[in-house]
Structures are given as structure tokens and as C-alpha cells.
Regions:
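A SAM-dependent methyltransferase catalytic signature shared across enzymes that methylate proteins
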Residues: 4, 223-241
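Short, flexible, mixed-charge acidic loops at enzyme active sites
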Residues: 45-48, 194-204, 253-256
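A short glycine-rich, Lys/Arg-flanked "PGG" loop and its adjoining helix->strand segment in the class I
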Residues: 168-183
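Short, glycine-/aromatic-enriched active-site segment of Class I SAM-dependent methyltransferases
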Residues: 186-218, 223-228
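Conserved catalytic loop of SAM-dependent methyltransferase domains
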Residues: 237-269
């Protein structure tokens, strides 16, 4: 038998390494065998925060707290550029986590409301927000809000769309609780990006470290993210990168997936870099993050959408 070429080897390797996910018609990946919704909800409530999974902690370092506030300031800036500076905002945050974004907008005079499977994140970071939290299944809570004719200027959802069992249904429900001239701000993990695929192909990464069969059914990349919203009746107003930590993976000394002992230092450095950029110029940082997103880079992607 003749030896296969490097390109043929890469194709075979890519097929083998993507055996648990499939690319859908929108262009992003999803699990071939998705978790049962009830089991996923139990995982969120009992493990996700308590075991500090997914980057959530009980006590964040100073640079992380500064980063969260800076990102909230940037998000408000993006939203205000579209909706106007003087508009009184009513905000719904689906998957509100520890409540840092809610607290920012509450401090700015907005009316806020949060939805989350678990109260643990808010309880241990912003307990003053517990009266604004609706705990439980986001589908059921949204249906109740629809029944009560509740509408919002902004519906925010961070790292939720890629974790729910039926993202199409979530977008359809959101469409019914956002005002016609309102916005949807949605952040997802950026997975199976061209950058990640290349690192897998060239051996920099030995496996798909971001694959989470228990709690993460959908894996968005930039194009698939935008296509998915477009197909569900939304217009994209802009996409922005967040968390540029993945660039560390190109250095064997800071490849935090292969060398997890470097992870905390890499995260701390990433926070410091983005905080420094924000301090130099918040507006320029927003523009930089938009350019990074255009190239599909960034550990997370923030999309701003309106209803068509």
C-alpha cells in the first residue's frame, strides 16, 4: 500500500476527531446524541456552580471582577449606540449566572429581571439580586411571561443558547418577549472555530477539550451563529469577540488545555490584557473585538440582534 499524503492524513484525523458531533445546516456543530433535558437541568443545579465548573467561582479575583464590569460597560455602550442614550431600559437576562450584568444595569437605573436554573451563582456573588431572579426552566418561565404580556427592551442571554436542548424554541420564545424595536444580546462559546480545527489538525491539541456531552449540546462558530439567528427571524447588528485567551494555545508553554497547571495564570493574564485595553479606550476596544469576531477568533462571541 502507498503512504497517504499529509493532507489525506489530516482529513482522516478530522473525521475521527469529530465523531461525537455533526455540522448542521446552519454551519455550526451539535452533539449527535444530545443529553435529556431533565438530566441536564439536574446537572446545572447540583454541579455547575457548586463544583465551580465552566469558569464559575465563588470568589473571583479582583481582575476578574474588573473584567466583568468592563464587559458590562462595553455591552451597554453597544446597546445604547442602537437604542439611544436616554431610553429607559427593561432588561431580561436568561441564564443570568452570578448576576454581574444585572447588577450593572440595575445600578444604571434599568428595570431588571433574571432567569436561571440555579440560584447558587447569585446567592454567592450578588445575593441582593435574589428578588429579581426567577429560578427554573427558562422555557416554562418565558411561556409564563408571554401569557402575562411581559415585554423587554433588551433580552440578554450569556452562554445559554449553546447549552439548552432546543435552541430554536428558545429563539422563538425570546422573539415574543422582546419589544419590536428592542434587541437581543446573545453570548455563546466559540467552538470548532477555524482556529481550533487547525490546532487539532496540526497536533497542538490532542483532543476536543471543549466537548461536554453532559451539558453542552450546541457548538457555535461565528458564521453558524449568525446563520442560525438569520434563519430564525433575526437581523444581526454586530458580533464581538470576548476572552482572547485561546491565543495562548499556540505557545507550548502556555497551552492550558494540554498543561492545565497554566490555566489560572493564562486566565489572569487574559483578564489583565482586556482590562488594559478597556482603560486605554473603551470605544476602540469594542471596535477591536468586532474585528477579532470577523476573523472568528475569541473564546466567546457576543452577537447583537433585532427581530426582522
Amino acid at each position: 500500500c502507498g503512504a497517504i499524503t499529509i493532507e489525506e492524513y489530516r482529513v482522516v484525523k478530522e473525521i475521527n476527531m469529530l465523531d461525537k458531533v455533526k455540522k448542521n445546516k446552519y454551519g455550526f456543530y451539535e452533539l449527535k446524541n444530545k443529553p435529556i433535558a431533565e438530566e441536564q437541568a439536574l446537572n446545572f443545579e447540583e454541579e455547575y456552580y457548586q463544583n465551580e465548573e465552566g469558569g464559575h467561582e465563588n470568589n473571583y479575583p479582583t481582575e476578574a471582577l474588573e473584567y466583568f464590569e468592563n464587559k458590562a460597560v462595553q455591552r451597554e455602550y453597544i446597546i445604547r449606540k442602537i437604542l439611544g442614550e436616554d431610553r429607559k431600559l427593561r432588561i431580561l437576562d436568561i441564564g443570568c449566572g452570578e448576576g454581574f450584568l444585572l447588577q450593572h444595569f440595575l445600578n444604571k437605573g434599568a428595570e431588571v429581571c433574571g432567569i436561571d436554573y440555579s440560584k447558587y451563582g447569585i446567592e454567592h456573588n450578588n445575593p441582593q439580586l435574589l428578588p429579581f431572579l426567577m429560578q427554573g426552566d427558562c422555557y416554562k418561565i418565558l411561556e409564563k411571561l408571554i401569557e402575562n404580556n411581559e415585554v423587554f427592551d433588551v433580552v440578554n442571554t450569556d452562554c445559554t443558547l449553546d447549552m439548552v436542548p432546543n435552541p430554536e424554541l428558545l429563539l422563538q420564545l425570546i422573539k415574543r418577549v422582546v419589544k419590536k424595536d428592542g434587541l437581543i444580546a446573545c453570548k455563546v462559546s466559540n467552538n470548532y472555530s477555524d482556529f481550533q480545527i487547525e490546532l487539532l489538525k496540526n497536533g497542538t491539541l490532542s483532543k476536543e477539550f471543549w466537548l461536554d456531552e453532559k451539558g453542552h449540546p450546541s457548538y457555535f462558530n461565528k458564521d453558524g451563529f449568525v446563520n442560525f439567528f438569520d434563519a430564525n427571524g433575526y437581523e444581526c447588528k454586530g458580533v464581538y469577540s470576548e476572552r482572547l485567551i485561546e491565543l495562548n494555545l499556540m505557545n507550548e508553554l502556555t497551552n492550558y488545555y494540554e498543561k492545565p497547571e497554566t490555566g489560572k495564570a493564562c486566565w489572569k493574564t487574559a483578564f489583565k490584557i482586556e482590562n488594559m485595553l478597556h482603560d486605554l479606550s473603551m470605544e476602540d476596544t469594542v471596535n477591536i473585538m468586532r474585528l477579532f469576531a470577523n476573523m472568528g477568533l475569541g473564546r466567546e462571541l457576543l452577537g447583537i440582534f433585532s427581530v426582522k
